[in-house]
Amino acid sequence: PNRFLVYDEPKWNCKLFLNYKTNQNNEKFIIDHISHELKIKSEDISIEYMSQKIHEKYSQNHKEMRVYCHRLYQVTLKTFPNIMQDNSFEIDGVQYYWMSISEMERDSRIREVNQDIVDFVKENCS
């Protein structure tokens, strides 16, 4: 993909990739959340596991170092609602943006708090 969906996360004051805590039935869990959040039928969403990364990172929420297990999935939408064709859009009060990796790398706040994840996505999706 040449652009990725990110959203404004007020707690971090940063644009982040969509993210969810790992769940027992992780792929269904992710599809259900994306379906609900983006107002797309779950049968129009497919998901593919790409990679995993375990590392230590500073938690903005907890103000301490924590160990994270990041699992990367690529999501494909069979239908693409008109609202999502804009560079930015809002659904249920959440502001979303389509951004390229290079745009993320130029964003100082993303570099400060999430460069490791941008690099992880870049390594596995290019």
Predicted regions and their residues:
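Conserved Nudix-box catalytic region and its N-terminal flanking loop in Nudix hydrolases
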Residues: 2-41
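A generic structural micro-environment signature
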Residues: 23-28, 46, 56, 60, ...
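Alpha-helical and coiled-coil interaction segments, frequently adjacent to or embedded
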Residues: 1, 5-6, 51-58, 67, ...
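Glycine-rich loops and low-complexity Gly/Arg-rich segments
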Residues: 31-32, 40-43, 71-76, 99-101, ...
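Active-site-adjacent beta-strand/loop module that shapes the phosphate/pyrophosphate-binding cleft
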Residues: 53-86
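A short coil-to-beta-strand element that immediately follows conserved catalytic motifs
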Residues: 41-53
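Nudix hydrolase/Nudix homology domain
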Residues: 10-22, 66, 80-126
